[in-house]
Amino acid sequence: MSGVNEIRSTFLDYFAKHGHEVVPSSPLVPRNDPTLMFTNAGMVQFKNVFTGVEKRPYHRAATAQKCVRAGGKHNDLDNVGYTARHHTFFEMLGNFSFGDYFKPLAIELAWNLVTKEFGLDRSKLLVTVYADDDDAATLWRKIAGFPEERIIRIGTSDNFWQMGDTGPCGPCSEIFIDQGPELWGGPPGSPEEDGDRFLEFWNLVFMQYEQIEPGNRVGLPRPSIDTGMGLERMAAILQGVKSNYDTDLFRSLIDAVAHQVGRPPEGAQTASYRVIADHLRAASFLVADGVLPGNEGRGYVLRRIMRRAMRHAQLLGARDPMMYRLVPTLVREMGQAYPELVRAESLISETLRLEETRFRRTLERGLSILDAETRDLSEGQNLSGETAFTLYDTYGFPLDLTQDALKSRGIGVDTDAFKAAMERQRAAARAAWAGSGEAATETLWYALRERVGATEFLGYEAETAEGVVTALVRGGVEVEALASGEEGLLVVSQTPFYGESGGQVGDTGTVAAAGLRARVTDTEKKLGDLFVHHVAVEEGRLTVGQAVELRVDHARRAAIRAHHSATHLLHEALRQVLGDHVAQKGSLVSPERLRFDFSHPKPMNDDEVAAVEEMANRVLLQNGPVVTKLMAVDDAIATGARALFGEKYGDEVRVVSMGEDQGGDGRRRTFSVELCGGTHVGRTGEIGLITVVGEGAVASGVRRIEAMTGDAARRHLAEESRRLAAVAGLLKVPPAEAADRLAALIEDRRRLERELSEARRKLAMGGGGAGEEPVREVAGVKLMARSVEGVEMRDLKSLADEGKKRLGSGVVAIVGVAPDGKAGLVVGVTDDLTDRFDAVALVRAGSERLGGKGGGGRRDMAQAGGPDGAAAQDALAAIEAALAAA
């Protein structure tokens, strides 16, 4: 028993036999913590269980958790490939007790697993405990029979774990193995502890305290256990190798890389094979869990991982996209343990292929510039920070990629100068922003918010309300009143008007009082909770301190509500049809239509669009209630509500749920559950109808779907029906047959165009205009020179190729004159004459007569063009003269 898959199974089976629930790995995108970039430890999915927020139907658990450390605090990216154990993706095996067993059983279970199940040599094992954790030290002596010198007390934070400044915390005990004196290094706590001889492979965390505030801890009434074992490290130990990259799983991936590049994974480029193998795992699992390459957040980290691997593929000589060809090997090795890899295999492959294709242009350009800039630098020197910043800012070449490219040559980067250049750019942007007047306006809103307080929003329950005017703004400054005919910004104590946010547009309506009538043309939110109404006074005066009645445009609000609820249904339908990688990237909810931007690497096909539309309408027709609850944010996320990464949520959030669906386990579940501050319909049936009206690209890896609901959808479909009837009338067929008839007509047109093109080509090769000789000899070389009309440039090239074949040895010059009088020119030289004649030089001689500039191509075939087709014969004469002079 030493294969990675077998080790994983042995661990989970062992703890299952000891009463632990085997819990599947949670996704790499944390469900219960929108502030965490990636899942980076086994305990992440149990965070709310440890804190008491969430209850589970079990008190013991075991997992094999997929983890990524490649961004923020936990970032191993730069070291990957150059050390024996650094990874961006790794698996953490862990067992957990939620107030059930504690230190005695935790240590006993760990000891029996490593010595009896895994069969490790007891004489090579040693442990660390926290400096004053006498209980753990006593238990290790009792259970393992360790002498005092093999129980090392550590007083640093390495052996005391805490979740944050507050919350559960406790001492740790780490298990080490002595890999032998042939490796440099000393035991933990010694000056040589960073060496490879003593390898830590399992950390046991004893959560026995709660930290109320820094320095103030109290005992937990029910202590818990959290452990983490690196699967890759344990595999290396059991397989008797000193590097994780020499284990069976990594050898399979590295061998697949070697097969693609056609060279063995040895020598100076070993690190490149390791980088590709590691990054392939990270990239594939991230895509499978819904992350796609982008320019911010998780998508940016994924892009960095992908591009670093792709640069190393280029170093190994790969000239075409290669990463996607490795995916089947990864799926074969890990797909049984992680079925999501199997389900997402085609998505992973396509994402890698597209990203590598795009990146090659950036890579080639950036490396060319980097080579030129570092040609005179030697080992130990630094590339200037200004140059590194130019590569980043102008050519899209990230700093870490520049550093990685120079690492093998021992050249560094002046990162301080890079940061200074970055800060100068930011300062310039801030100055430009301040100069635009926006900074002064923002200062106004901060001061106003401080003085009048937050606006109370009543719009979830009401569309009319009374409020007191607390501030008026006109031309960027506060005023006491707005007169009839004036426009400005209105702040009131409370309002039913929704302020634009979360993609939903602001409400419109009216403001009224005795002798006052004003229109609200838009509503926005400033600083999160200050509602600002754009008003135009039509009659009377609007003054600070005045009591007013505010009335929302009901019909417009109803249309917005329908579109917003439809957005939620479409979001979940997209996830179910396309996959779990779908995540919201932006939205717009208006009375007329909705648009929803989401992560997806390629265009949706017609069947996918139809399936999404059908699913959303099926849930709509259930006419189920749309339920809104106020919940603590942790409770909301623990229930499965979708939150946006990076979004700042308050302590209390609105959770909007709608529809029913059948889950994969056959149980009924809520179709859509999202954190949302917008306005929604009361029942899904009020949406009326959802029709998708468009799908397209927004950015790399981001698609946009557009749809209409209710009356807007009905009007759209009626107009589409009228257009279809008009087209069918022109085609003289029933509407149901219009598409087939149109397709047949288009194919007929294409056939006729092909036939016409062929006829023109044959006519052109069959003879020229007046005064042209089909073939003549110039300077001992056969020259075929012709001018033709109505032949496109691509056909001129094929004519030149055909002419070269007819001549066997010679030069072909053809001018094609278009109907608008412009001309194209092609010159071909047979291979036996390219040492004497250059087609590029000949074509340039002719293009001058056509009014063109230059021309380009190869010695055997070149092309040019010009605006003066009337000079076709002059161009041919110039080519003949150039040929004679050559």
Swiss-Prot record:
Zn(2+) binds at H564, H568, C676, H680. Its cofactor is Zn(2+). The keyword Ligase applies. GO terms for cellular component: cytosol. Disulfide bonds: none annotated. Its main location: cytoplasm. InterPro entries: aa-tRNA-synth_II/BPL/LPL, Ala-tRNA-lgiase_IIc, Ala-tRNA-ligase_IIc_anticod-bd, Ala-tRNA-synth_IIc_core, Ala-tRNA-synth_IIc_N, Ala-tRNA_ligase, Ala_tRNA_ligase_euk/bac, DHHA1_dom. Its EC number is 6.1.1.7. PROSITE patterns: AA_TRNA_LIGASE_II_ALA (PS50860). The keyword Nucleotide-binding applies. GO terms for molecular function: alanine-tRNA ligase activity; aminoacyl-tRNA deacylase activity; ATP binding; tRNA binding; zinc ion binding. GO terms for biological process: alanyl-tRNA aminoacylation; negative regulation of DNA-templated transcription. Keywords: Aminoacyl-tRNA synthetase, ATP-binding, Cytoplasm, Ligase, Metal-binding, Nucleotide-binding, Protein biosynthesis, RNA-binding, tRNA-binding, Zinc. It is an enzyme of class 6 (ligase). Binds 1 zinc ion per subunit. It catalyses: tRNA(Ala) + L-alanine + ATP = L-alanyl-tRNA(Ala) + AMP + diphosphate. It is found in: Cytoplasm. Catalyzes the attachment of alanine to tRNA(Ala) in a two-step reaction: alanine is first activated by ATP to form Ala-AMP and then transferred to the acceptor end of tRNA(Ala). Also edits incorrectly charged Ser-tRNA(Ala) and Gly-tRNA(Ala) via its editing domain. Consists of three domains; the N-terminal catalytic domain, the editing domain and the C-terminal C-Ala domain. The editing domain removes incorrectly charged amino acids, while the C-Ala domain, along with tRNA(Ala), serves as a bridge to cooperatively bring together the editing and aminoacylation centers thus stimulating deacylation of misacylated tRNAs. PANTHER family: ALANINE--TRNA LIGASE, CYTOPLASMIC, ALANYL-TRNA SYNTHETASE. Belongs to the class-II aminoacyl-tRNA synthetase family. This is Alanine--tRNA ligase. It comes from Methylobacterium sp. (strain 4-46). The gene is alaS.
